Curated annotation (Swiss-Prot):
Protein name (record): Beta-2-microglobulin
Organism lineage: Eukaryota, Metazoa, Chordata, Craniata, Vertebrata
Keyword tags: Disulfide bond, Immunity, Immunoglobulin domain, MHC I, Secreted
SUPFAM superfamilies linked: Immunoglobulin
Family indicated by similarity: Belongs to the beta-2-microglobulin family.
Listed InterPro entries: B2Microglobulin, Ig-like_dom, Ig-like_dom_sf, Ig-like_fold, Ig/MHC_CS, Ig_C1-set, MHC/Immunoglobulin
Keyword Secreted belongs to the record: yes
Location of the protein in the cell: Secreted
Length: 92
């Protein structure tokens, strides 16, 4: 089943623009659904890297979006894959 890591590109500072990454690894087959969320709502503008595969033929992909952290906003990454019973959400 997929492994999910959510992290910012730069050390987070409230009010300072940053990039939020959702790195998903160890999945097969390659079809996967990745959504990034702000306060539970889907962020519409998310960019995806090309799908790549590791030596063991499992796949990995990076989703990322621009964001500006604040004290109150909650960010997360939600992943759905055929190997999972239900989507998994990982909070930042």
């Amino acid at each position: 089943r997929p492994q999910i890591q959510v992290y910012s590109r730069h050390p987070p500072e409230n009010g300072k623009p940053n990039i939020l990454n959702c790195y998903v690894t160890q999945f097969h087959p390659p079809q996967i659904e990745i959504q990034m969320l702000k306060n539970g709502e889907i962020i519409p503008k998310v960019e995806m890297s090309d799908l790549s595969f590791s030596k063991d033929w499992s796949f990995y992909i990076l989703a990322h979006t621009e964001f500006t952290p604040t004290e109150t906003d909650q960010y997360a990454c939600r992943v759905n894959h055929v190997s999972m019973d239900k989507p998994m959400t990982v909070n930042w």
